[in-house]
Amino acid sequence: MSWSRHWPAPAKINLFLHILGRRPDGYHRLQTAFQILDRGDELAFRVRPDGELRRRGGLDHVPPDQDLTVRAARLLQQTTGCRLGADIVLDKRLPDGGGLGGGSSNAATVLQALNRLWGTGLSTLELAGLGLRLGADVPVFVHGRTAWAEGVGERLTPIETPSRWFLVVHPGCRVSTAEVFAAEGLTRDSAPSTISALRAGRVRNDCEPWVRAHYRAVDEALGWLSRFAPARMTGTGACVFAPFEREAQARAALDRLPAAWQGFVAQGVACSSLLGRLRGEQDSADRDGPT
């Protein structure tokens, strides 16, 4: 069978992250805003008739049973009873473990793409439900919209954000999400916030002080980036970002990036490139269908 290529898995940044408390099951109650970016990883798929799932590229060092792309495909098989398999190739363009949602976005793209290619016919809501079983960030990528999020991050409300460009910097270290959320000194009692507070800039990242105190590279990157625009950490790190009104401003700052770090410029978008692809395929199917 032929390859189906150029399936995007876009990045996100957390415009803020408030921790409201901890649930009895140990998960934290959060408020955040997921800003989808126009940059990310890319996947390709080839349907297999034998039911096997084979992945290569990007994260070859990760065992298949720990890889979200394979786990997402297997979950879709098990849920629908589909007997088809797939070859999956991941072109990894985002830094691993940087707080950009790369693994979650990869899983969401697998669910959406194989749902189409296998003809399993699940709705977006059903796919988002499967995604939540894989990780709290997966549903926002399944829906493909910049959103306000609550709960563990799964209760989503699409929001409009200003048209901005972002300089995203990876300071060369990896921060463990589990370590951050288990930390004794982490703020866990923030008052609930509002979308109007976000728009007024009265928000923060509750994980940032602890990470800055324990990861010198993140602290240095935030200090450097703050020289150009208000900087903040995304998620639990290690990536940090700053917003700019114009692309040229962001690229001028990127040109001065210290050699030890990596960075890129991306635009914030309301709808993801994955959602755009799915809509384009549906429009094509509608045009080609019977009249």
Curated annotation (Swiss-Prot):
EC number: 2.7.1.148
Functional summary from the UniProt entry: Catalyzes the phosphorylation of the position 2 hydroxy group of 4-diphosphocytidyl-2C-methyl-D-erythritol.
Pathway assigned to this chain's UniProt record: Isoprenoid biosynthesis; isopentenyl diphosphate biosynthesis via DXP pathway; isopentenyl diphosphate from 1-deoxy-D-xylulose 5-phosphate: step 3/6
Catalytic center residues: K12, D137
Keywords, comma-separated and alphabetical: ATP-binding, Isoprene biosynthesis, Kinase, Nucleotide-binding, Transferase
Cited Gene3D superfamilies: 3.30.230.10, GHMP kinase, C-terminal domain
Catalytically driven reaction(s): 4-CDP-2-C-methyl-D-erythritol + ATP = 4-CDP-2-C-methyl-D-erythritol 2-phosphate + ADP + H(+)
PANTHER family associated with the record: 4-DIPHOSPHOCYTIDYL-2-C-METHYL-D-ERYTHRITOL KINASE, CHLOROPLASTIC
Top-level lineage group: Bacteria
Provenance organism: Alkalilimnicola ehrlichii (strain ATCC BAA-1101 / DSM 17681 / MLHE-1)
GO molecular function list: 4-(cytidine 5'-diphospho)-2-C-methyl-D-erythritol kinase activity; ATP binding
Alphabetical list of InterPro entries matching this protein: GHMP_kinase_C_dom, GHMP_kinase_C_sf, GHMP_kinase_N_dom, IspE, Ribosomal_Su5_D2-typ_SF, Ribsml_uS5_D2-typ_fold_subgr
Binding site for ATP: P95, D96, G97, G98, G99, L100, G101, G102, G103, S104, S105
Family to which this protein belongs: Belongs to the GHMP kinase family. IspE subfamily.
Keyword Kinase: yes
GO biological process, one term: isopentenyl diphosphate biosynthetic process, methylerythritol 4-phosphate pathway
Protein name: 4-diphosphocytidyl-2-C-methyl-D-erythritol kinase
EC class (word): transferase
